[in-house]
Amino acid sequence: MLIQYHKISNNDPNRIQLLSMIFCEIILLIFELFEFAAIIFNMSRYQFHFNLKVVVGYAIFAYWFDIIARITIAFFEIGLFNLDDQTIAVETEKLPWNYKNMFFMLLFCCSTYRVYFMFLICSVTLLLAVERFLATIWVSTYESVQHKWVSIVLTSTNSIAGIFGSLLFHYELIFDTAVWCSLGLCFNFVSIFLYVILFNSNKSKIELCQTREITQSYTLSLRFQLNENLKIMNWIKNSILVVTCFNTLLAGFLIASNNEYLKNDYPVLVKCCHTFLNLGIAIYAQVVFFVAILADRHFRTYFLRFKPIRVFTKPFFGRIFPEDFKIKKILSTSDETNVYFSKLSLQWDEQIIRSSHVVVAKKKRFWRV
């Protein structure tokens, strides 16, 4: 059974280094618990399409629970929760409904969820691509008719397939680890290919709207939706590229940490790969978060309006984007009215002065004549 767990024993030559990395990972995960909880809390205020919010929210919720699962496994690895190798060897020979050791059941559930989440991060790019594909097809009605069934079908299908795939992975059925990782990477590459097609399709439609006479099929609202769809796809594209790069790198660590030959002959290397894999996922989530928030100026300005996001990102990027992180002073209605009419009065005075100068100049020319 391929449980995502490698205990750090007292005999490990790199024990101090491995424990240091795990403690750094736990600190980062605790920080991300609060960070992503704040994002989830504010998700209802984001002005995106319902289906897009559900798919993104589904991924964020899944990662939030994955953080809890990983911290639990880390407690087993550093010895905070005690589970000896003999108990694990006995329990792995049984079927899930015959497990009796509560600690092993907790470890198995957390490990199953971790692999399910790995499947999710490989397939979420495909979910976004399919959601944007349907937004392109039904662009004329996608905002007025929300098509909520789209997000329900996508997320429920992904959940069922992910849990089923995780169980097959743990019991080493059908495919080995390398094939499962290759399958996940294929999802990424298919989604990139689909994104390129959809991006060019939206771009050509917008160009067509601009070069031909406005007809019933290309109304102003339809062109606006096409343009918004194009902007959202261009924004998500940056995140997809980062996700694909990280998935490719982490797939190598996952294969190495579950390889039987390496487990027997190079156990220290396997533990290092396992630690790098878990720390890499924590860093990966943080990088994707920063890329999604800050990669595009339009969306950077939009997201930084929300205080939790601004608080979490300012220590890292406040000096890089100083103008975007400035908190604009909000005036009261009476103050805004006074400022508006003061500007209007100033413009009116300037216009009168310019007009008087023109009249004087005309009179001078008249008397010269």
Swiss-Prot record:
Subcellular localization: Cell membrane
Annotated organism of origin: Caenorhabditis elegans
Cytoplasmic side: 42-55, 140-148, 200-234, 296-369
Protein name: Serpentine receptor class epsilon-2
One function term, GO molecular function aspect: G protein-coupled receptor activity
GO cellular component entries: plasma membrane
Topology versus the membrane: Multi-pass membrane protein
Keywords for the protein's UniProt record, in alphabetical order: Cell membrane, G-protein coupled receptor, Membrane, Receptor, Transducer, Transmembrane, Transmembrane helix
Pfam families reported in the protein's UniProt record: Sre
InterPro entries: 7TM_GPCR_serpentine_rcpt_Sre
Main location: membrane
Source superkingdom: Eukaryota
Any one GO biological process: sensory perception of chemical stimulus
